[in-house]
Every structure is written in C-alpha cells, then in structure tokens.
C-alpha cells in the first residue's frame, strides 16, 4: 500500500507503516513515497 509520506530511505517509512499496519509491517521507499506491506 502506498501511503502519502515522503521519503528518501525506507527507514523513514518504517514508523508510519508500523503505526498504520502494526508491528509486523514492512516498508519500502518507492518514487519518493512510502510503501507499506504486511508480511
């Protein structure tokens, strides 16, 4: 799921993704936006 959070690295996405999807959520930075996924 792409969320509306700007990023330059996946680390910036980890907290917002975990806040939204819980502690097991993963995060990537794609095209300057965060992408969250559940494992």
From Swiss-Prot:
Positions of the record's site feature: Aromatic residue of the functional dyad: 37
Pfam entry (one): Toxin_2
Predominant location category: secreted
Modified residues (Asparagine amide): 39
Coiled-coil stretches: none
Keyword Endoplasmic reticulum recorded: no
Domain commentary: Has the structural arrangement of an alpha-helix connected to a beta-sheet by disulfide bonds (CSalpha/beta).
Similarity-based family: Belongs to the short scorpion toxin superfamily. Potassium channel inhibitor family. Alpha-KTx 02 subfamily.
Name the record gives this protein: Potassium channel toxin alpha-KTx 2.9
């Amino acid at each position: 799921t792409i969320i509306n959070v700007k990023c330059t690295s996946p680390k910036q996405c980890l907290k917002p993704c975990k806040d939204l999807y819980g502690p097991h959520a993963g995060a990537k930075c794609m095209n300057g936006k965060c992408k969250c996924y559940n494992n």
